[in-house]
Amino acid sequence: MAPKRKLSDSDAPEVVHPSRQVQVYGDEPKPAKKRKSEPAFNKKQAHASSVNTIKKKIRDTTRKLERAQDLPADVRVENERALAAYQQELASAEAEKIRQKMIKKYHMVRFFERQKATRQLKKLRKRLLETQSTEEVEQLKEEMHILEVDLNYTQYHPLSETYISLYPPKGSKEDAEDKADKEKPPMWKEVEKCMEEGTLDRLRNRKPDITISTTKPVKLPERKSIKHKPVPKPKLEEQAPSIDTTGMNRRQRRAQRGVKDSRATKIAKNKSTGFSKNQAFGAVEGARADEAQDGNVSDGGFFEE
């Protein structure tokens, strides 16, 4: 059996088709592919669906700080730092939510205007190659610069901000000259400046200047100093001077000491309206009975004279 040929001994250039010579590297190592490295500011932020979760965390942390007044110092500081981090995270999520909304809203307008600017730019380049007069060349270069800025405007306009259209709608009666001389939006100048500085990507992904309101400002409760009420001292009862009660009965002794008679108080309490009427009626009937006994009235006996 014949031995295998080495790759260096084979006629590789003759066997391989000329159109595929680039794919045959021979002894040289295969060149590594360059990976596209995205800048740090172009990273995708928190998804818009996490806004409610972050708001719930902010509410829980706020209630914990407001209601628990006797928290230790280290726990309180940790919760305050967590609350600040949640608020910053909520602002980023709200900004991403606005960004996605703006992208969806102005996607078709940007696409059509980009296609229109590309077509017009191709026409001007073709005319530039065909023309020979220097004046026309200068004029075409100026128009090409305007269209290049228009094209970059459609591509690198900030995604989080309102997009202002460059071209009028189809129903307008403006001529081509009026369209060229039309006043550009304020962002157009910024795009032209960023083209010179090479910061178009940063302009495209910049955040809006509008401050996003996250939640109501949290007012942390002030610690109230506990004031201990002074304990009242027991009052010393003044001892009444001793009274000589020899030779007095019980009622007299109680009157001398200033003790109220419980029996008299009970009688006074029971003197209601009905009780007083009955008492008056009994007094009248008693007086009549006394008069009957004193007078010469027959009692129905057998020994009357």
UniProtKB/Swiss-Prot annotation:
According to its UniProt entry, the function of this protein is described as: Involved in rRNA processing.
Task: Return the annotated region ranges for Disordered.
Answer: 1-72, 169-305
InterPro entries in UniProt = Efg1 (IPR019310), EFG1_rRNA-proc (IPR050786)
rRNA processing among the record's keywords?
yes
Name listed for the protein in its UniProt record: rRNA-processing protein efg1
Q: Name one GO cellular component term.
A: nucleolus
Comp. bias (Basic and acidic residues): 59-72, 171-209
Native species of this protein? Sclerotinia sclerotiorum (strain ATCC 18683 / 1980 / Ss-1)
What is one process in the GO biological process aspect for this record? maturation of SSU-rRNA from tricistronic rRNA transcript (SSU-rRNA, 5.8S rRNA, LSU-rRNA)
Name any one Pfam family assigned in the record.
Answer: Efg1
- Xref: PANTHER family: RRNA-PROCESSING PROTEIN EFG1 (PTHR33911:SF1)
- Chain coiled-coil ranges: 49-155
Q: Which gene encodes it?
A: efg1
What keywords appear on the UniProt entry?
Answer: Coiled coil, Nucleus, rRNA processing
Location(s), subcellular: Nucleus, Nucleolus
Family named by the database record: Belongs to the EFG1 family.
Task: Return the Polar residues bias intervals.
Answer: 270-279
